[in-house]
Amino acid sequence: MILKKPSEIPDVVRGDKVVALVDGKGLNIARVFSSVFGYHGYSCINILGGEVGRIIESECNAQKMKTESFWISGSNRINTALVYEYEDRMLMINEPGPIIDHEEKNSFMTFFEKKLTPGVNIIISGSAPRGFEGEDMMRLLDIAEHSNCRLNIDVAGNWLCEIVSRSPDLLKVNADEFKASFGIEKGDLRSMEEFRLSHSIKDLVITDGKNGSVWLCDLEKLRAYSSVIRSRFSVGSGDSFFGGLLYGQQKGMSHTESLRLATACGAANTISYGAAQFELCDVEKTIDEVVVRRIKC
């Protein structure tokens, strides 16, 4: 909800504009694939429940996103972002969301395994319903690894600490989350590279908002940033960045061009309110503003 001016009534918020959309890290990546690049060679698995879940499924179908729905008894959550435009700040209000029970978790594992094609790219991004614990994530990874799938990961918190022990092929992580989990400072490239090597991670991508990102791998080390900052509203920019990066890799782009495209997608996301609400023309506008350089660790 967009607030363009202060409220005249204390403790009462009346919005000036509402931007309603189905959201979630996986869905944001799917939206970048489908709506921005017209790419449909993917399937996004949603854990859905209740009336909100039915709305999510309906909107995904309307936007021609390729999704698979797994239903649970609880209801999906509604989150609200209050954008105080006149103060250039935002307040995010997140509901706790549904709880997934033991039987539902076991059913989901079977559902997930049946959907897998050996050797495909698996993207694990964001969170899961309450009750889905670290041990459940490890079971999910076991299934993926048994099918020789490439693991592309963007998670935080306890899951992040556990997943790195499984040496994902690509780990994309926010710099603040990286520091909180592993104690490595933002500018400490040498420690980042030592971390990558010690955990046998092929591609380590660390993002830092408007300050850009670094991509560390055996082939090369790169830094990228946008030379133009259009807005401080960046909700969904990390997901848009990841979507652009994955699309670039899928299309066989070089590391430099994939990172350039990813950075352009992250910047394009700030043009409009709402996660991944930009178009290809926005990416074409921002990509010339992206700087990519080789770095040394």
Task: Put a short name on every predicted segment.
Residues 135-222:
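Conserved phosphate/ATP/ADP-binding segment of small-molecule kinases
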